[in-house]
Structure formats: structure tokens, C-alpha cells
Amino acid sequence: MTPHRVLLIEDDPLEAALAKRTLRQIDKTIDVIRLRDGAHFLEFYKKNRPVKGISLAIMDLHMPRIDGFGVLKVLQDNSERTPFPIIMFSSSEDKEEIENAYTMGAAAFVNKPVMPKAYRAALEHIVNFWLTTNRR
């Protein structure tokens, strides 16, 4: 199997560890690269341009320094289209935030559940759709 490199943009270290462990349990070929926040993502993106070998980015919405909207805005303002989908993974259920994420270029917005089984199911949905069904 071809390994998948997934960017995980998450400021909370415990949340990041949980997501990384869960993604690896779902698919052992996933290599997770954790970036602390939106600013760290933009630094990574600029430094590694053109970015190759990344299958997917899973990004929290609310983070310090630059949040998920800030990342999408910078990419949009620079007419950048990443070669990989950016999935917003957030506990926000605010319809306006969800609509804004799509308008600004997010490929999907997936609710981040609190309960462990639902959390795993949400990540399985992301992996199954974006890394298996809808490969670019």
C-alpha cells in the first residue's frame, strides 16, 4: 500500500496525540505530520512549495496565532489552491462558520465529536472518503 502523508493542524497537544493515534489505528499507512497552528502550516507550506506527497490536511478551526479561517484567507488572497484537500475538523456547529469555511475553500467541514466512538467514526469517514474514494 502507498503511504498517505496527512497534515494535522491542531494546537492542543492532547487532541493532536488522540487524532494521530486514531488515524494510525484506522490506516497503518498514514504518516501524520502535526503542525501546531495556522501560522506553522503557512510556514510549512511556503518552505516546501511546491508541496508534494501530502494526501490531505485536517485542520482545527479555532487556534492561536492564525486560525483555520486565517489560513484559508491567506491561501484565497494569494489565489493559492493546495494540491491536497483541506478538511476543517472542528467542534463548532455554527452554520455561519461552516458556510464561511466552504466559501473560503475548505473541501469539507466535519464536526469533531467529544465521544470516543463518534470521534473515531468522524476520522474514519474522512479517511475513507478523502484517502480511498475521492483520491485526487
Write out the residue ranges for each language-model feature.
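Receiver (REC) domain active-site loop signature in two-component systems and cognate sites
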Residues: M63
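Conserved acidic segment of CheY-like receiver
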Residues: P3-L23
